[in-house]
Amino acid sequence: MENISPALLEWFYKNRRSLPFREDPTPYHVWLSEVMLQQTRVSAVLPYYYRFLEELPDIPALAACEEERLHKLWEGLGYYSRVRNLQKAAKLVCAQYGGQLPADYAALRALPGIGEYTAGAIASISFGLPVPAVDGNVLRVFSRLYNDPGVITEPAVKKAFTARVMEHQPPEKAGDYNQALMELGALVCVPNGAPLCGQCPLAEVCLARAAGTTAQLPQKAKPKPRKIVPVTLALVESPAGFLVQQRPQKGLLAGLWQPVLWEGEHLLQAEVLARLAALGLDTGTAAPAALPAAKHIFTHIEWLMSGVQLHVPVQSAPAGYVWASREQLRTTYTLPGAFRAYKPLLL
């Protein structure tokens, strides 16, 4: 196949979106944007990106930020392990590299939370290094370009595709080339069997288009079935606020805050009241109101939630819990998106 970079770059320079991390592609800006964009659309990321940089404009500020504030700045983006790894890496960068990301692919790759793709994006876009940056968009483009039925989630297939990506990369324009492939996958060679081939600068050399197989590519492994977990919530409110507790520092939703809940079972109202009493809580005489059922899908787990809302008298919080006002829930305590259906009741 002829080299695709001239046609690809010509298209990119005419059609690329104006994005803040492209207009000012410092290593920190590219790093932050790539981490935020994992599992999240550009349009959803931009408000968070601006807000995050306004408060944490550089790597030393990120390294010094208190964890609770860091979670609050990330609230709504989900996948909070991303921002925890971001801070771990920032602390190492401050300790080892004077607060500046190293201009070296292997050194970037060694930092917490920075995988092959993110390291490649930083190294090529910010430092101009001729390295690959292969994400799902790029894999989809090359799967169709070469009409390759390989399962793109398999390491050997990804390695082969990466080699093909590098065959076409102009070393002096590595960053632009990598971004152009990502942009092509995001805007034209889109997923779900509906590529906009009429707008594609590579249409004339695309083997899947010639074979009529674009709708079947790329091939992906069948997803594993999610584990279904019943969850019972209790939105307990007193004049002091809502009763909340912090989740453990490791595991699902680590370090975030939640209402009273019990994972693994759906409880009747009487059972909820008995459990609250066992915590030492005076539930008063007001009858609880049933919460609407809701669900939240994690990567491999699906929560099916139900529960109650009730008002209780003024009292001390049970051990391990705190009373949080609506204002504190808005500004201080980070509630994960898993409770999105109930946030209007809490905020």
Give the ranges of each region predicted by the language model.
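Intrinsically disordered, low-complexity, charged terminal extensions of DNA damage-control enzymes
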Residues: M1-S18, E23, A186-L347
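Catalytic cores of DNA base-excision repair glycosylases
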Residues: E2, P6-G198, L202-A211, A215, ...
